[in-house]
């Protein structure tokens, strides 16, 4: 169970997007999969500033009442728990993997959005397989020869801002989808009265 979500393949090419582009990307996912279970797999740890993006997003989503969140500051989806959690993912669920990454200087503060999986801990040679139906990687800092140190010394302000942008995009898309669902149900019920 869940094994189909963790595969050893090269992820699809990701699009580099800002907060508005991320909003459009997430809205498409939610509208394309209306009625299906969507799990937001927020990968990372609360023990590294740069790598806390995923758990921060998970906590913000939980606070906003978004269902299907795995990985928060309280219960992170980190190197120790990811393999076990991946096995519990339902085979028919849509998985949106969310993680921090290092990248080019011009990409810092932006997001890599992909209609395919991401490889957790790639910049630090974590050895994980790809995971996710879709993925969002937040470029929290510039890639360097010392990725662990770079993640540790990443700006908390930047990480928190980016986590807020991801959570805002998801929460507002979920709310819009719910509103459309209730509106169409109300119209349908009104048509039968």
Model-predicted segments: where are they?
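N-terminal catalytic or cofactor-binding beta/alpha core of small enzyme domains
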Residues: 1-193
């Amino acid at each position: 169970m869940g094994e189909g979500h963790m595969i050893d393949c090269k992820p699809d090419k990701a699009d580099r997007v800002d907060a508005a582009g991320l909003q459009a990307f997430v809205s498409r996912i939610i509208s394309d999969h209306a009625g299906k279970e969507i799990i937001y797999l927020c990968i990372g740890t609360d023990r590294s500033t740069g790598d806390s993006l995923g758990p921060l997003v998970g906590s913000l989503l939980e606070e906003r009442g978004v269902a299907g969140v795995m990985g928060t500051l309280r219960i992170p989806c980190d190197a120790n728990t990811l393999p076990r959690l991946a096995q519990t993912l339902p085979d028919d669920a849509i998985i949106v993997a969310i993680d921090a990454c290092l990248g080019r200087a011009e990409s810092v503060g932006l997001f890599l959005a992909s209609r395919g999986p991401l490889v957790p801990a790639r910049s630090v040679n974590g050895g994980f397989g790809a995971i996710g139906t879709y993925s969002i990687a937040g470029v929290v800092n510039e890639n360097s020869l010392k990725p662990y140190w770079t993640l540790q010394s990443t700006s908390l302000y930047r990480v928190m801002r980016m986590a807020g942008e991801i959570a805002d995009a998801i929460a507002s898309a979920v709310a819009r989808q719910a509103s459309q669902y209730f509106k169409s149900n109300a119209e349908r019920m009104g048509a039968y009265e």
